Amino acid sequence: MSLTSTSKRLVSLDVLRGITVCGMILVNNAGACGYAYAPLKHAKWDGFTPADLVFPAFMFIMGVSIYLSLNKSNFDWRVSIARILRRTALIFVSGVSLKWILAFIATGEYNTLENLRIMGVLQRLGICYGIVALLAVTVRHRLFPTIIAVLLVGYYLLQLFGNGFEKCAGNIVSMVDYAVLGKSHMYLGGAQFVDPEGILSTIPAIAQVMIGFLCGKVIVGEKEIRSQIVKLAVWGTSMFVIGYLWSYAAPLNLSLIHISEPTRLRCIS
């Protein structure tokens, strides 16, 4: 898992990225929706299938890539902040524009701003990239584990006291999406109650990217491959155990990203 001397690329990360892209192609082009192979379908609510590993893997990859990229400038905010803000805006706007174009191709009609979906996959990637990258150049990295714990536990408490585990309009995640985004700007016009890439569920998504960032730090900081493998294996096993135990209180759910989801699925990456 070392960086090659000529290209300065992390081969293991490129391999994981390639596997994830292949998985995305299979999931997004699985054939007729009613006849797709079951493992290529997303879980409808609680639980997860192999298809649900794709997006979390991208989040993990982004976290590792953020460390590798900002490490080149020694995490100097004066050098990096303009690039971070520009890239964040570009990713977010690209996501909104792509949704608008695809909607036109599918229906032949232009979506107005009144019913254009605001959030989405690229939008979430852009938001998470921007926040984690800004934290990386402004906050001591040793505080990242604490921030991750605060984000995950805080999100769990919001769900616990806000009916956050039910698929209904009274779910706090749904209520915030309705209030901030508006029903017409949500996934499927709000018919699914929650937006899979909504406002509150972005909180644990940020933690996912931060976990990838810390793994990138291990890969760069530990010069011996054996040491890298041991440390990452210990982290991965620990996260799996924590996620498994916590799943009894908060079952795996990709739409809401319960606290058990970032820990268990990130250990697989």
Question: What kind of feature is each model-predicted range?
Answer:
Residues 2-75, 80:
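N-terminal signal-anchor module of multipass membrane proteins
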Residues 2-12, 65-83, 214-231, 248-255:
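Juxtamembrane membrane-water interface segments of multi-pass membrane proteins
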Residues 10-37, 90-103, 131, 241-246:
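Kinked, hydrophobic transmembrane alpha-helices enriched for aromatic residues
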Residues 30-49, 102-118, 167-179, 184-195, ...:
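Membrane-interface interhelical loops and short amphipathic "cap" helices
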Residues 51-57, 72-99, 103-132, 136-155, ...:
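Transmembrane alpha-helical segments and their boundary/interface "anchor" motifs
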Residues 54-71, 125-134, 201-221, 239, ...:
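Specific transmembrane alpha-helix
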Residues 141-211:
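Long hydrophobic alpha-helical segments that form multi-pass transmembrane helix bundles
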Residues 255-269:
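Residue-level detector of conserved catalytic or cofactor/ligand-binding positions
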